[in-house]
Regions:
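Helix-turn-helix DNA-binding segment
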Residues: 691-764
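Alpha-solenoid helical repeat architecture
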Residues: 161, 173, 199, 236-239, ...
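Alpha-helical sensor/transducer elements of the RecA-like P-loop NTPase core
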Residues: 37, 64-122
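Amphipathic alpha-helical segments of the small helical/lid subdomains adjacent to P-loop NTPase cores
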Residues: 94, 102-138, 164, 226, ...
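Short capping/hinge segments at domain boundaries that bridge a core fold to an adjacent linker or tail
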Residues: 36-38, 144-151, 170-175, 183-229, ...
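Extended alpha-helical scaffolding segments used for macromolecular assembly and cargo binding
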Residues: 24, 220-301, 310, 639-661
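Amphipathic alpha-helical segments of tetratricopeptide repeats
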Residues: 281-282, 312-316, 344, 348-352, ...
Length: 764
């Protein structure tokens, strides 16, 4: 099969027709470009001698070709590679009058060639592998056997230097390293003449594949080791050279050093860096020499158990030079596992500047305020005032300020810390991020609008992404955006640290409760119970523990959570009951008491919230709402007051809570007008978009409310669950069902459900 481009076709046609007689033409191109195919195409052209592979002819043979040129009427077309170029060949080429340029296939020619060859291969893949070199496209279309045979012949003809050069290029050697091999200058030209290299000097994938299949592995490894030693001598990068040797069983001091150096180059790929450190140890490097960096890489890759094991070996090794750094890695891993108190102890033992700041965060989070303040006072930067040092120090100060100062002060400090850390966040293994800590402070003070962009920027940095996505999901849940919360929850993935898993379970519990999905809540509660047992309470886990408290009340399992809530209260007491953090626990406690119908307990939480009302608008809002809840529980519903409180809750980001307050007040009032007003308020705050009435295929039209009831009945919810979801009574749901049954002419409940399923399907 031959497929020439249009200019080449025109020239060949002119030669065959005699219009170019006498033709004196050279075709000089690397192997695979189709020189022989062109000569085959010209076979039979009148008065034209065709000479192939002229670069391989002897001087005597070339002299005989040159003598033919003495006859001015004789035609000659010579095909040759650019190398070798003996003097006799140059003399012949110098007497020719033109040159035919052969080009690689473009996409249309590749597609046409494959179609004619009857090979349904992906065109883009073929081009990527072959660089469009026509001969390689043909070989690829012919199958592996033909491909390997052709390359075997070429490699058998290649000299030792050419093969060395090809193997070096396949190994990823850059031009400087290739030059360091000190191969003859002609070697590069000889290799280029094979057609194996692309325009950028890199090996074409199809040629690299052939080398790997045809050259024994021990020879390829030996050449790679030679390159590695040269690169180490010149302090050059070795990652691309070393990476294929992982798992190859190669050992020795040079190899171990190369693996270690490569791991340092792979900090942006922690899983790869961890494998390289492991390979260094297998090659002969002592674990104590690389253990801390290995542990950090493993931790960055999310394997905190292995990170702790490795770091512990370093800490327990008397001859390890970086025991302090090992303790810092262990402290960070423990923080991700939710062991904040133990984490703080390791950070204190480490006693580096960064570790002391991390210890302040851990001590504060575990309720040890005096120790945290003392440690921050004596903390100083050991080295230069870098961005990283400033960011870590500010994070510690911001967390402490969240307990001892105004929330706005703490939030401002943590935001500055997050901004400072952004350009250098990949330089240290963080126990938590300033962005996450700032978002927690923002969520506890009603500043979700500040938390959201802070978290989005943190997600884009690529550090602690699941942590930041889960907090974005929390914001969406509080706003009543179930779809957005679930999307962020899914984006966080399944491979979560214990701390992130706690938040993920808390989100699922919160979403099920807000959807009045009692069956779903019972299912996820099994995980919630496990999370509560496995994860100690700390200051930064009040959000999920608050959700667990309310859900426990809904499921009648408050006793199971009581010891953990007692720990939370003791922790707060150790910090002086800071309003920022205490209010969140009292707010969830209030709702748990409301669900459990414990008015005295609810009153105690409402009183605590009232005492914190002066801390800021958010705290005043939830204190006022708590007072409304107490009145509603007592049967006293002041519609304007409830509506105002509900709208204020919506304004501080507690959209679902605001809608629930209005809805529950509506259900409990005996004033028909007040009920309608509050129900309308609840629907508006919940953000339910109104839709037109749905028409059944039989012509019966359902109202918006009937359609909502129908969807929830078909979904399997009980009348009480539907009432809770729509802020109406179960009796009203029953009334809607009776009306729909009558209008649809259903003779039984089964018929009614079948009709409703059809209507819901049509509507969707």
């Amino acid at each position: 099969v031959i497929l020439l481009d249009e200019p080449t076709e025109r020239v060949c046609a002119a030669i065959k027709s005699g219009r170019l007689a006498p033709v004196r033409l050279a075709i000089v191109a690397p192997g695979g470009y189709g020189k022989t195919a062109v000569l085959d195409h010209l076979a039979g052209a009148p008065g034209v001698r065709l000479v192939d592979d002229a670069h391989l002819l002897t001087d005597a043979e070339l002299s005989e070709v040159a003598r033919q040129l003495d006859d001015e009427s004789a035609g000659l077309v010579i095909a040759a590679r650019p190398h070798p170029r003996p003097a006799a060949l140059n003399q012949v080429l110098g007497r020719l009058t033109g040159q035919l340029v052969l080009r690689p296939f473009d996409r249309p020619r590749t597609e046409t060639f494959l179609s004619r060859a009857g090979r349904p291969l992906a065109v883009d893949s073929v081009l990527a592998q072959t660089g469009g070199v026509p001969g390689f496209v043909r070989l690829l279309a012919g199958g592996d056997g033909e491909l390997v045979a052709a390359f075997r012949h070429e490699l058998d003809q290649a000299g030792e230097d050419s093969l060395c050069y090809l193997l070096a290029v396949e190994a990823g050697a850059d031009p400087d390293l290739l030059a360091a091999l000190k191969l003859p200058a002609s070697t590069v030209e000889a290799v280029r003449a094979t057609g194996y290299l692309g325009p950028d000097g890199r090996l074409l994938p199809v040629a690299a594949r052939a080398l790997r299949e045809l050259v024994p592995a021990d020879r390829r490894i030996a050449l790679r080791l030679r390159l590695i030693r040269r690169q180490l001598d010149r302090s050059g990068p070795v990652l691309s050279l070393v990476r294929p040797l992982i798992g190859a069983g190669v050992t020795g001091a040079d190899v171990a050093t190369a693996f270690e150096v490569a791991a340092g180059e792979a900090t942006g790929e922690p899983a790869l860096a961890a494998r390289l450190y492991e390979a260094a140890v297998r090659a002969g490097r002592r674990t104590a020499a690389v253990g801390t960096r290995w542990a950090e890489a493993v931790a960055r890759a999310g394997d905190f158990d292995t990170a702790l094991q490795l770091a512990d070996q370093v800490i327990g090794s008397d001859d390890a030079a970086d025991r302090a750094e090992g303790a810092q890695v262990a402290g960070a891993a423990l923080a991700h596992r939710g062991q904040l108190a133990r984490s703080a102890e390791l950070f204190q033992w480490s006693d580096t500047a960064a570790a002391r700041c991390f210890a302040v965060i851990g001590l504060t989070g575990s309720g040890r305020l005096a120790e945290a303040e003392k440690l921050l006072d004596k903390s100083s930067v050991d080295g230069p005032p870098t961005l990283l040092a400033g960011a870590v120090s500010s994070a510690a100060r911001g967390v402490l300020e969240s307990v001892t100062d105004q929330p706005t002060v703490a939030l401002s400090t943590l935001i500055r810390s997050a901004e400072m850390l952004e350009p250098v966040s990949d330089r240290v293994l963080l126990p938590d991020s300033p962005a996450a800590l700032g978002a927690l402070v923002a969520l506890h003070s009603g500043e979700a609008a500040i938390a959201e962009p802070l978290l989005e920027r943190a997600v884009s940095s690529g550090v602690l992404v699941p942590r930041h996505r889960l907090l974005l999901a929390w914001i969406a849940m509080l706003r009543g955006d179930e779809e957005g919360a679930n999307a962020q929850l899914r984006s966080a993935g399944e491979q979560l640290s214990p701390r992130d898993w706690l938040f993920a379970v808390g989100l699922r519990v919160g979403l099920a409760r807000r959807a009045s999905d009692l069956a779903g809540l019972r299912r996820i509660w099994i995980q919630a119970r496990e999370a509560v047992v496995r994860h100690p309470v700390d200051l930064f886990t009040f959000l999920p523990f608050g959700e667990f408290e309310v859900a426990a009340a809904r499921l009648g399992e408050r006793d199971r959570l009581a010891p953990h809530l007692r720990q939370a209260r003791e922790l707060l007491a150790g910090l002086g009951d800071p309003p920022l953090w205490a209010s969140a626990l009292h707010w969830s406690g209030l709702h748990a008491a409301v669900i459990a119908e414990q008015p005295e307990e609810a009153a105690a939480h409402a009183e605590a919230l009232a005492e914190a009302a002066s801390e800021g608008p958010y705290f005043a809002t939830i204190a006022r709402a708590a007072g409304c809840w107490l009145k509603v529980l007592g049967g006293e519903v002041d519609a304007p007051e409830v509506e105002s409180a509900a709208r204020d809750l919506h304004g501080v980001g507690l959209c679902w809570d605001g809608a629930r307050l209005a809805g529950q007040a509506a259900i409990r009032t005996s004033d028909r007008k007040a009920m309608v007003t509050l129900l309308d308020c609840a629907r508006v705050l919940q953000g339910r978009p109104g839709r037109e009435a749905v028409e059944h295929t039989g012509g019966v039209r359902l109202s918006e409310r009937e359609r909502q009831v129908a969807e929830l009945v078909v979904a399997g919810l009980t009348y009480k669950q539907i009432g809770d979801r729509l802020f109406i009574s179960a009796k009203t749901v029953e009334h809607h069902m009776a009306r729909m049954r009558q209008r649809l002419g259903a003779g039984s409940r089964g018929e009614l459900l079948a009709e409703l399923r059809e209507i819901v399907q049509v509507a969707s």
